[in-house]
């Protein structure tokens, strides 16, 4: 793939609620010139491709079609949303084994097509499935990316913005760690238009310390709330994926919170994918952005990574997954 290439091709694997919402976001935001959609329900992908194509007169030209794995061979980006959905009362980590099997089958077929681009993983549990995509593909770690805490960070910024009465785009704050129950807020570096969050709150008295705790809990548990109300989350993550896609296809070198391979960026955190900011462009992860964490935040990062690593190690101790690993 070249950063100057004008015809950008995306293959989406998984045409469920997240996948179809992502496809819609690509069309409405004029991202990419070609979109192929793969799903086991071929007729559904044909219907979605036809339906989406009817929006092109209002947006920009794009080739949209129901694809096969062979179509991945010259894609710039393959986006993986295929997987069993998270059910009410089920954590993202409960999904591990069934979605690892799906991931192994999908990634094996994509690699067999001759695909040389970038993997973007969104299926849950995303940090573990990003790791397994890296293992099953044999690709360099920079070319396997997970959506990570991109949505969590967006929720965090929006919640803070609503609380203090500013535009969410003026709030700069990250959620790091697992995209899930062990994630944490990086309070030490949160700011509003360059003003440290604590300084802002001291001057404006918008919320007290307990209010911040409650705000974080609402962000962390947002998916459970939405799933209980409507069965699934898909709009927010779809737009987050579209943003990451644009950063890759346009070679933006944008800093986004993603699921990034760990090899000692943070003390005691290695051999796993986990959410942290990173520079991303046409060739994948350019480099991680290692925000200096305070002691409490570092402990949370380590605890989150240890939880993921334990699940990864247990999963890849099984022959069906260990035998398929290429990395």
From Swiss-Prot:
Keywords: Allosteric enzyme, Cytoplasm, NAD, Oxidoreductase, Phosphoprotein. Coiled coil: none annotated. It is an enzyme of class 1 (oxidoreductase). Beta-D-fructose 1,6-bisphosphate binds at residues 157, 172. One of its GO terms (molecular function) is L-lactate dehydrogenase activity. It catalyses: (S)-lactate + NAD(+) = pyruvate + NADH + H(+). The modification Phosphotyrosine is found at residue 224. Its EC number is 1.1.1.27. Its main location: cytoplasm. Allosterically activated by fructose 1,6-bisphosphate (FBP). InterPro entries: L-lactate/malate_DH (IPR001557), L-lactate_DH (IPR011304), L-lactate_DH_AS (IPR018177), Lactate/malate_DH_C (IPR022383), Lactate/malate_DH_N (IPR001236), Lactate_DH/Glyco_Ohase_4_C (IPR015955), NAD(P)-bd_dom_sf (IPR036291). Substrate binds at residues 86, 92, 124-127, 152-155, 233. It is found in: Cytoplasm. Pathway: Fermentation; pyruvate fermentation to lactate; (S)-lactate from pyruvate: step 1/1. Catalyzes the conversion of lactate to pyruvate. Homotetramer. This is L-lactate dehydrogenase. It comes from Streptococcus equi subsp. zooepidemicus (strain MGCS10565). The gene is ldh.
